[in-house]
């Protein structure tokens, strides 16, 4: 279980100094229907002849690498950058911090 705080003080390239950053998890955007590869694929698929390209079935990994999106909280900066961290099964953003010697309650 990886628990990352929602804010982090780190270097901002635009400001040129350490600033607090808002941390969110990166999500992939929706694929464009008009990208060259997509247009080519749709053209090839149309008409008779079934599936024209191989469908990938050999999945090797069980996890994805976590990518954090850091946004500077300075009002006139707001620059964003990505930061990749290691692979993990469970990822949590801004969860409760673990305490030493604390009694677990259910």
From Swiss-Prot:
It comes from the Eukaryota. GO terms for cellular component: cytosol; cytosolic large ribosomal subunit; endoplasmic reticulum; nucleus; plasma membrane. GO terms for biological process: translation. Ubiquitously expressed. Residues 26-53 are annotated as: Disordered. It is found in: Cytoplasm. The modification N6-methyllysine is found at residue 53. One of its GO terms (molecular function) is structural constituent of ribosome. Disulfide bonds: none annotated. Keywords: Cytoplasm, Methylation, Ribonucleoprotein, Ribosomal protein. Pfam families: Ribosomal_L44. Its main location: cytoplasm. Gene3D superfamilies: 3.10.450.80. Belongs to the eukaryotic ribosomal protein eL42 family. This gene has no introns in its coding regions, and therefore, was most likely produced by retrotransposition of the original X-linked gene during evolution. This is Ribosomal protein eL42-like.
């Amino acid at each position: 279980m990886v628990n990352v705080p929602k804010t982090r003080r780190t270097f901002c390239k635009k400001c040129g100094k350490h600033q607090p950053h808002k941390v969110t998890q990166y999500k992939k955007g929706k694929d464009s229907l008009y990208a060259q590869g997509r247009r080519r694929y749709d053209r090839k698929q149309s008409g008779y002849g079934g599936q024209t390209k191989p469908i990938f079935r050999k999945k090797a990994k069980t996890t994805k690498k976590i990518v954090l999106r850091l946004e500077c909280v300075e009002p006139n900066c707001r620059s964003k950058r990505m930061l990749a961290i290691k692979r993990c099964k469970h990822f949590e953003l801004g969860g409760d911090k673990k305490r030493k010697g604390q009694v677990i309650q259910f």
